[in-house]
Regions:
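C-terminal catalytic core of Y-nucleophile DNA break-rejoin enzymes
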Residues: 170-190, 204-225
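Short, basic (Lys/Arg/His-rich) helix/loop patches that form interaction surfaces
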Residues: 223-263, 267
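Conserved tyrosine-mediated DNA breakage-rejoining catalytic core shared by Y-recombinases
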Residues: 147, 151-187
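N-terminal core-binding DNA-recognition domain of tyrosine recombinases/integrases
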Residues: 9-25, 31-108
């Protein structure tokens, strides 16, 4: 839990106004970034910081965190200060004068798991509890975002008249329905059985993934689960986001249409595929997108 007590009553009141429409996980994420900056500034009033102090803070996070995290911290704080400027709490947004950390969107072979590496993950599944097994296979076979997995509810799992199973992912313009791999659904059934839930999946608003202390799970929980699994498999160089990269790159390498990948991953633009063009010559000639027809992926023997 973040130490929110270092925020003044006024700062916390402003944050609550700013975060009214955010979901709980996003709200917590924003708050953690604001508290981080407050701590760095030795609890100086956030309404009185200068562009120089903001720049020093961004330099600090660039030395401490990954580039993508630095970009996120900058974007969150820029948004928060824009809100304060718009509501006349401050005269100007100091982050306007701070250079945004740049992150390359081009993916390389270091961002992509090979089929052999995915097989290594499958081999270590027995070391994980049933919930964590479902999470790992779900990430590997759907290409979903972490927040989509975290927010998954039982009503999002669909079965057609031929007993094919699908999952509804995303919201609004990014909402899409993708097919579940049979082994992924088998694990989901095992997970329900272990959790004492009925065999029939009812369309409830309950979250699919929970913890012993909560009826939901957080992004951080998932990252820790993925890290543990990757460490077991000797693949600690990867992280949770690399499952999505792998899904996209390997599918494109096998010749999947950019429009199909756009729909599967919820991209707003099919030309996001350009991000992956440099990796296509390095990945295996198998596709996670079509793993149900792939004899080289051990998941199909489960």
């Amino acid at each position: 839990m973040e130490n929110t007590t270092i925020l003044t009553d006024k700062e916390f009141e402003i944050f609550n106004q700013f975060s009214q429409k955010l979901n709980p996980n996003t709200k917590h994420d924003y708050l953690s970034k604001i508290v981080l900056m407050k701590a760095f500034l030795e609890e100086k009033d956030l309404l009185e910081v200068t562009k120089y102090e903001c720049n020093e803070f961004i330099d600090y996070v660039k030395d401490k965190y990954a580039k993508s995290t630095c970009e996120k911290i900058y974007s969150y704080l820029h948004s928060f200060y824009n809100f304060m400027n718009k509501k006349k709490y401050i005269e100007i947004n100091p982050f306007t004068y701070v250079k945004k950390p740049e992150v390359s969107r081009i993916k390389t072979k270091d961002d992509v798991l090979s089929v052999q590496e995915i097989n290594k993950l499958v081999e270590i599944l027995p070391k994980l509890n049933i919930r964590d097994r479902v999470i790992m296979i779900f990430l590997a076979t759907t290409g979903c975002l972490l927040n989509e997995l975290v927010n998954l509810k039982w009503k999002d799992i669909i079965m057609d008249e031929k007993n094919n199973t699908y999952v509804r992912l995303g919201k609004n313009k990014k909402e899409r329905v993708v097919k579940l791999h049979p082994y992924c659904f088998k694990l989901i059934e095992d997970y329900r059985d272990y959790s004492g839930l009925s065999e029939v999946i009812l369309p409830t608003n309950d979250f699919v993934f929970t913890t012993q202390k909560s009826n939901s799970i957080t992004d951080r929980n998932v990252r820790l689960i993925v890290k543990k699994a990757l460490d077991y498999a000797g693949l600690s160089q990867y992280s949770a986001k690399d499952f999505r990269h792998s899904f996209a790159a390997i599918s494109l390498r096998l010749g999947a249409d950019e429009e199909d990948i756009k729909k599967q991953l919820g991209w707003s633009d099919k030309y996001y595929a350009i991000r992956y063009k440099y990796v296509l010559n390095f990945v295996d000639s198998e596709s996670v997108d079509y793993i149900m027809n792939n004899d080289h992926l051990s998941i199909n023997n489960k």
